[in-house]
Structure formats: structure tokens, C-alpha cells
Swiss-Prot record:
It is found in: Plastid, Chloroplast thylakoid membrane. It is an enzyme of class 7 (translocase). Belongs to the complex I 30 kDa subunit family. Its main location: plastid. It is a peripheral membrane protein. The keyword Thylakoid applies. Signal peptide: none annotated. GO terms for biological process: photosynthesis, light reaction. It comes from Glycine max. NDH is composed of at least 16 different subunits, 5 of which are encoded in the nucleus. GO terms for molecular function: NADH dehydrogenase (ubiquinone) activity; quinone binding. This is NAD(P)H-quinone oxidoreductase subunit J, chloroplastic.
């Protein structure tokens, strides 16, 4: 079953895959990384003017990484705004996704956090860098195949 947005994307020849609906009835769509930036601009023009959240996760050890976007269509006088969830899957060997910072500025720190924790590189992000881990940190702590470094902090006994 396709939702309203999925039907609209099909009507306009925009390639995607419907992943169904969540428990709240919010449609989830899968977009290819190479199509993401152009579809993001189209969604913004279509009325999805608010990036509610962006997060990322490791699908399986040695498997794909996912970047997830929750978009909302805010309009004056509407009690129940329309929402959509977008998922983009990338290979962990070279995880690159176009940044949507230039579409929704609120993606700034969210994309930085996904980079810092999972190593997903957001192309054309103006200041992509680590924000939680030290710049010298090696590896991506939230990947399921991450091996924690074996170090101990020595503290004073006083």
C-alpha cells in the first residue's frame, strides 16, 4: 500500500521504495543516496519545511549503515501536520550521502553526530567534523563491529 507522498513521487517519476507505515501511520520511504539531494529539494518545495530529526544506525555487523530523516509539513491552521520518514542505506566501506544542510539548516549538528559516531560522510556539508569524540579518535563507536580501545585512565588516590 502506497501513501500519499509515495503516490505523488511515482506520478512524477521519482525513484524510491515504499517501506510501509510505522505504528503512528507515518509513511517510510527508501531513497538511493545518489537521488537524495534532488528529492530532498523537491520535498522541501512540496512543503516539507521542517526537519524534525536526523539520525543514523548500523543495520547489522558488516552490513549497511542507515541515515534516517523525519520530515514534517508545517502549515498554518493545520492541527495534524503531514510527516514522512526517509531512510538512506549505504555500504559501510565508503559511506557517503549528500548533505541536506543547504536545504534544512537544522541538519548541521545531526549530520555531524552521525559522522562522529558511525563514520557516514555527508558530502558538501560545510563543517563536517567530530563533535562528541576527540579529533584524534580512531574508529566509529556506534558501529556494531567497533572494537573499543583497551586503555585505562589513571586517577589520583587523593
Amino acid at each position: 500500500m502506497q501513501g500519499r507522498l509515495s503516490s505523488w513521487l511515482v506520478k512524477h517519476g521519482l525513484i524510491h521504495r515504499s517501506l510501509g507505515f510505522d505504528y503512528q501511520g507515518i509513511e517510510t520511504l527508501q531513497i538511493k543516496p545518489e537521488d537524495w539531494h534532488s528529492i530532498a529539494v523537491i520535498l522541501y518545495v512540496y512543503g516539507y519545511n521542517y526537519l524534525r530529526s536526523q539520525c543514523a544506525y548500523d543495520v547489522a555487523p558488516g552490513g549497511l549503515l542507515a541515515s534516517v530523516y523525519h520530515l514534517t509539513r508545517l502549515e498554518y491552521g493545520i492541527d495534524q501536520p503531514e510527516e514522512v520518514c526517509i531512510k538512506i542505506f549505504v555500504a559501510r566501506k565508503n559511506p557517503r550521502i549528500p548533505s541536506i544542510f543547504w536545504v534544512w539548516k537544522s541538519a548541521d549538528f545531526q549530520e555531524k553526530e552521525s559522522y562522529d559516531m558511525l563514520g557516514i560522510s555527508y558530502d558538501n556539508h560545510p563543517r563536517l567534523r567530530r563533535i562528541l569524540m576527540p579529533e584524534s579518535w580512531i574508529g566509529w563507536p556506534l558501529r556494531k563491529d567497533y572494537i573499543a580501545p583497551n586503555f585505562y585512565e589513571i586517577q589520583d588516590a587523593h
